[in-house]
């Protein structure tokens, strides 16, 4: 049984995945397997990928899905193929940061045997800009409070590490369509009592570049024109209920308080960023439609919150919405690094 299973949900982008696998072959630690779930790729290169892996003598498991399962189901399927002690989740256009990444992670995880989830940092492949979602190295502990405090740190999937047996034990299709399956699993593992290990190390280079190849991105999508202001329910709407569901069996009488903390983080940090980003890549009207989709009657629909809590959170929603719709984008761009640092410092103190 290998120590690591590199779990990759695959759909097209085969050139990027082959390059990522080529770099895996260079790792000083070879105690790993690659687990690829192909979500009905249409580029016809599945056999080419497998042939490359065979010729490279890399241990791998490859399975093509019979139907398109989209992101959540495909990630769950990739984890389901794993047999290692730990699963390292990777996007199919991301790669490990350097040749000693697995060796470093192996030593750390052996010294922390109660780890259920580990989170690492990442940097941009082209620019080298580092995103420090973890600002120190250490054991954050376990339990529902730790899960509630940390769930936003796994929104980017690459470089998130799960204890394999627990990730497979918590497999569910309840949140298919949320595009945050890793967030549910991470929160559930930590809430049930396994440690969350934060690692201030860059383990991943994201968004690989290959000459003559390109990948689709949200920022490159054409603008809607005309763009009416109509309610648009995004995956963000499910975030609070998803994390609540993950911690619920272990929350006891504190569930409402945990749900309030979850929604406060969504409303103060995740939601305004999404609205401002929608204004940047689409339009003000498009962003306003997203705001309508997040209105309190939708946001609270899967939570049994007391009336007072709904009123207070609804008031916060209204204030944040107004701020996100009127703030100059130039001001947000200038303040974004500082706001990111503030959000991290707040969570470190809680």
Question: Which positions does each model-derived feature cover?
Answer:
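C-terminal subregions of glycosyltransferases and related glycan-biosynthesis enzymes
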Residues: 179, 184-187, 191, 201-350
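Glycine-rich, basic loop-to-helix element that forms the pyrophosphate-binding segment
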Residues: 65-82
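A conserved acidic beta->alpha catalytic loop
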Residues: 38-47, 67, 95
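Conserved donor NDP-sugar-binding/catalytic core segment of glycosyltransferases
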Residues: 100-133
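Short beta-strand/loop segment that forms part of the nucleotide-sugar
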Residues: 32-40, 63-65, 91
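Short, well-formed alpha-helical segments that are part of the catalytic scaffolds
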Residues: 12-26
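Short aromatic/hydrophobic "clamp" motif used to bind/position activated sugar donors
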Residues: 87
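Conserved nucleotide-sugar donor-binding catalytic segment
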Residues: 120, 138-227
């Amino acid at each position: 049984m290998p120590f690591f299973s590199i779990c990759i949900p695959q759909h097209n982008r085969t050139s990027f995945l082959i390059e990522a696998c080529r770099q895996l072959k260079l790792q000083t630690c070879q105690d790993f397997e690659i687990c690829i779930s192909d979500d009905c790729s249409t580029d016809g290169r599945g056999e080419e990928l497998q042939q490359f892996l065979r010729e490279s003598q890399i241990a791998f498991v490859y399975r093509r899905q019979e139907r398109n399962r989209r992101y959540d189901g495909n990630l769950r399927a990739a984890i389901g193929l794993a047999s290692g002690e730990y699963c390292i989740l990777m996007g199919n256009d991301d790669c490990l940061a350097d040749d000693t990444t697995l060796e470093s992670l192996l030593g750390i995880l052996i010294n922390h045997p109660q780890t259920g989830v580990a989170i690492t940092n990442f940097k941009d492949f082209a620019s080298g800009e580092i995103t420090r979602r973890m600002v120190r190295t250490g054991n954050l502990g376990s339990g529902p409070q730790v899960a509630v405090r940390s769930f936003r740190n796994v929104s980017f999937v690459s470089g998130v590490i799960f204890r394999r047996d627990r990730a497979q034990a918590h497999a569910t299709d309840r949140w298919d369509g949320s595009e945050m399956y890793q967030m549910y699993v991470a929160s559930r593992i930590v809430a049930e009592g396994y440690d969350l290990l934060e690692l201030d190390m860059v383990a991943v280079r994201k968004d690989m570049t290959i000459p003559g190849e390109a990948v689709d991105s949200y920022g490159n999508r054409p603008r809607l024109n005309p763009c009416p202001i109509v309610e648009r329910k995004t995956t963000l709407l499910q975030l609070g209920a998803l994390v609540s569901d993950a911690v619920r069996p272990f929350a006891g009488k504190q569930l409402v308080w945990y749900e309030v903390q979850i929604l406060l983080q969504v409303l103060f940090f995740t939601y305004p960023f999404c609205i401002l980003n929608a204004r940047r890549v689409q339009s003000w009207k498009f962003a306003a439609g997203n705001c309508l989709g997040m209105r309190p009657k939708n946001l609270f629909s899967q939570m049994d919150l007391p009336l007072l809590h709904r009123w207070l959170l609804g008031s916060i929603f209204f204030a944040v919405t107004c701020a996100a719709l009127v703030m100059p984008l130039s001001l947000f761009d200038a303040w974004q690094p500082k706001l990111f640092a503030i959000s991290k410092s707040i969570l470190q103190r809680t």
